[in-house]
From Swiss-Prot:
PANTHER family: ATP SYNTHASE DELTA/EPSILON CHAIN, ATP SYNTHASE EPSILON CHAIN, CHLOROPLASTIC. One of its GO terms (molecular function) is ATP binding. Belongs to the ATPase epsilon chain family. Keywords: ATP synthesis, Cell membrane, CF(1), Hydrogen ion transport, Ion transport, Membrane, Transport. Produces ATP from ADP in the presence of a proton gradient across the membrane. InterPro entries: ATP_synth_F1_dsu/esu, ATP_synth_F1_dsu/esu_N, ATP_synth_F1_esu_C, ATPsynth_dsu/esu_N. This is ATP synthase epsilon chain.
């Protein structure tokens, strides 16, 4: 069976390193499904979940919360470089919930003061928190 090596790398080190037969990520142009022998690609990634169908007897699926970054696909090696990434099993849900509440509060405050930059920053924080919460439930 043809397979790919999947690595997710952050400034904190390698967060994921396994063999897979299918990967799904989200780019600014939409969802991208990746199978072995995919053409070479470099693309930006959105804050979203990453689905990885591993090469295993039980057809296991792993989920990773990706907070943006870049994907490179070359010679059946998929490398994702991201500011941060967390596997579903590693997500601290209570921390993510607190981050969600904090971002919602920051959005409301920034909108009342018409601080556009702060609204944008808080919306990014909210997307990241919601992404982590959603991935933790997979």
């Amino acid at each position: 069976m043809t397979q790919m090596t999947v690595q997710v790398v952050t400034p904190d080190g390698i967060k994921y390193d396994h063999h897979a037969k299918f990967i799904s990520v989200t780019t600014p142009d939409g969802e991208m499904g990746i199978l072995p022998n995919h053409i070479n690609v470099i693309a930006p990634l959105q804050v979203h979940e990453m689905k990885i169908r591993r090469v295993s007897e039980d057809d296991r699926v792993d989920w990773v919360a990706i907070n943006g970054g870049i994907i490179e696909i070359k010679d059946n090696v998929v490398t994702i470089v991201a500011d941060s990434a967390e596997r579903d099993r590693d997500i601290d849900v209570s921390r993510a919930e607190r981050a969600k509440l904090r971002a919602e509060r920051d959005i409301a405050e920034a909108e009342t003061t018409h601080d556009i930059d702060e609204v944008r920053r808080a919306k990014v924080a909210l997307r990241r928190a919601l992404n982590r919460i959603n991935v933790s439930k997979k």
